[in-house]
């Protein structure tokens, strides 16, 4: 593809060197057997993961070491976090606040890369719904997937209207099932996730009841802490491949949308809405920006008793967000 040529040799050399420096410390105290399989996820809410998988760049890189690449589809942050915690994948894609919740509750993950800054969730109602405001959700059935950004977005949104989780009837459904329930009239509202949310808008005329970009947390590429310590060089190579996919997507947005359309089985218009208008790929390096965003979002976890009392969430944010890599890249 012609867009790949945009990735200059100098950039890749800087990336490799910076990542090595940024992650070397993680493996300084760990000795591990050679990697036998690279296990990671892909997700429709992470378009660059679809690009990376489609072009086989990881397979190409690891083939010389005789290491196969195993891809697992994550239907939501909750699934990716389950896979990470169960040691069935080593690298997984989630929302930032969902990753923080998981880390606070004992899932040993770290985040050395940010795959997007999205507006991937909002509160959705049918086009003819009488619901006009957040206050109207009181006593209503609202579908949302627990342990994901849409669920946490719902809780934060309710809080702005003086409501809490107990003021609605939460219906815990996986994202696709939540949309199906909304279309069938089984719930009054749904805390959506792209590309399903974009499909609801364009294909069903659904209305976004409440949007708040700042309540959408970043797309975090999480690594099991043990794996990061034992295989920092391999993590470096995965991040370098993600960077290649990010650069290609920025240069070939329509082509990337076609890949998203084919993989997620949505129309090209839906994929373009998600990728062009609601996905920011400009800042992949974990930094103070991401730390501050999670610190601002974290109080909802304690307000709704989603973490144990007394958990120091600022400390957990520091344990999760691995800013060493980003700081090194910025100096390169």
Provide a role label for each language-model segment.
Residues 97, 170-171, 176-262:
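Pocket-lining segment of extracytoplasmic ligand-binding domains
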Residues 301-332:
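Conserved C-terminal helix/tail region of periplasmic/extracytoplasmic solute-binding proteins
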Residues 62, 88, 93, 103, ...:
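Sec/Tat-exported extracytoplasmic proteins
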